[in-house]
Amino acid sequence: FQLSNDFQVTRLMHKYLPEDQKSLGYATLLEWRNILYTPPSSVLNVKKTQVRMGAVQWQMREFTSVEEVLKQVEYFVDALSDYKSDFALFPEFFNAPLMGLTDQMDQTRAIRFLAGFTEQFRNEMSEMAVSYNINIITGSMPLIEDDRVYNVSYLCHRDGRVDEQRKVHITPHERRDWVIEGGDKFQVFDTDAG
């Protein structure tokens, strides 16, 4: 009956029912494939055909603490996450108002002061990327490495990974006033959105 109704023999199973003497414990697994059934597609490992980007228009204003800036960052991340954005893109030197927290009149020292917050911003924004399920492009921040200052932006993936890109083409102002050095390579990053 089953074979005449398009059931297919999938496999023979040994010791399926050991107490059945007539079959010697064997069973036949049959499968009927419904041609009208479409299985639900997996949301994992799917190539996206559209990507939603959220560009943050950041108002430069006075901030009195890193926490205050991070609170504003989280406001935008939360809003863009509600819109199901794949990426939140922050502007270059979005944390620059924190240079006002130092009494340094020397611009080189002020940018080095600002670089002291970069790791905290990177870590906090990486946690937000995971919490809000959105990839965050941090906008550039100063980074000190081997006593040199670089202008670096981070890609905080929603799975917790963090990639970085150093600005290659430094503006004359950055080079002259902040003594920022340029990076020497372009990175290409794989994300869950392409």
Enumerate the predicted regions with their spans.
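A short, hydrophobic beta-strand-centered structural micro-motif
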Residues: 116-144
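A short acidic, glycine-rich active-site loop
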Residues: 1, 108-123
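Active-site beta-strand/loop signature of hydrolases that rely on acidic residues for catalysis
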Residues: 53, 72, 77-107, 129, ...
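Terminal substrate-recognition subdomain of acyl/acetyltransferases
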Residues: 1-46
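N-terminal phosphate-binding loop and adjacent alpha-helix
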Residues: 57-79
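Beta-strand-turn-beta hairpins that frame and shape the catalytic cleft
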Residues: 44-53, 188-194
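Active-site catalytic loop in hydrolytic enzyme cores
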Residues: 127, 143-194
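Surface-exposed, active-site-proximal loop segments in enzymatic domains
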Residues: 98-113, 150-155
